Amino acid sequence: MKALSKLHAKPGIWMTDVEKPECGYNDLLIKIKKTAICGTDVHIYKWDDWSQKTIPVPMVVGHEYVGEVAAMGDGVRGFEIGDRVSGEGHITCGHCRNCRAGRRHLCRNTYGVGVNRPGAFAEYLALPAENAFKLPDDVTDEMAAVFDPFGNAVHTALAFDLVGEDVLITGAGPIGIMAAAVARHVGARHVVITDVNEYRLDLARKMGVTRAVDVSKEKLSDVMTELGMKEGFDVGLEMSGVPSAFSQMLETMNHGGKIAMLGIPPENIAIDWNQVIFKGLVIKGIYGREMFETWYKMASLLQSGLDISPILTHEMPIDDFEKGFETMISGQSGKVILNWD
């Protein structure tokens, strides 16, 4: 079958012909319809330090997808041939304390689809059935293809109560922008997002943020004054991994504020702990999606009228995958969809 693989230990991803995966006793065999390019895939494409330490070569990559059930193992219940599905890319062990306590997203032995085992950039994907999510009919294939990053956004945005709160989001990448849309949808008062990429700040404006701020041209303190904010932000969503953005978040948080961190900063980031301690801030790390509460929330948010379609900026056939990666790397895009049909 056709697949995109990390074929060599150097920059690039290659179109390959690989064996169709076998469907195990508890697996679904999923015929892939659409995939999306993730920032993780870009890291793998560039072959950065993290990728060199993490990704086995050769291996099929990719983990954002939608497809149909083409075959089922004998032990599978609850699915039928033809069901539309997406799937949780974190495959957990089932026997550690967190798994047994129902906190599978905190499994200490997680394996990643397209990271530690063959991925979804292929005509077929074999996946444990317990990791598959059956999609409601009113969720489009395009939306379902980005459920993985949308889930990161939902998990982060809903980490703390947002109703009536002023929310600062640092980092207007696709996940940050989707988190901003979620925050507005669930009742936040002001949602302010910061970045230096004007293309993506414009996308955030289309998604309904109160203010999208280019911090290279505008002071966040001036925006807060403009909005009549006297006491700082109640909730912060750190999506950038940029140390200066996190420092600015700490400075502008209200006393008793809460911060959810999804962005991954460089090692040994300096933190002004006086801001954290004397303001009584709560900082929570966010990893992946809660299984499967986040997935049900994603579907419900879309069904209740949340529109994140502006984030889907490019769509192209799989044979144009090089163009897709170039578009993502340029920073002049939201999510890029690759069609396998």
Swiss-Prot record:
Official protein name in the record: L-threonine 3-dehydrogenase
Family membership noted in the UniProt record: Belongs to the zinc-containing alcohol dehydrogenase family.
Annotated active site: T40, H43
Keywords, comma-separated and alphabetical: Cytoplasm, Metal-binding, NAD, Oxidoreductase, Zinc
UniProt subunit comment: Homotetramer.
Entries under SMART domains matching the protein: PKS_ER
Textual note on the cofactor: Binds 2 Zn(2+) ions per subunit.
PROSITE patterns with a match to the protein in the record: ADH_ZINC
Residues noted as binding Zn(2+) 2 in the record, renumbered to the chain: C93, C96, C99, C107
Gene: tdh
GO molecular function: L-threonine 3-dehydrogenase activity; zinc ion binding
Superkingdom of source: Bacteria
UniProt pathway annotation: Amino-acid degradation; L-threonine degradation via oxydo-reductase pathway; glycine from L-threonine: step 1/2
Organism: Idiomarina loihiensis (strain ATCC BAA-735 / DSM 15497 / L2-TR)
Binding-site list for NAD(+): I175, D195, R200, L262, G263, I264, I286, Y287
Segments forming a coiled coil: none
Record field: catalytic activity: L-threonine + NAD(+) = (2S)-2-amino-3-oxobutanoate + NADH + H(+)
Group of enzyme by EC: oxidoreductase
Entry keyword annotation includes Amino-acid biosynthesis: no
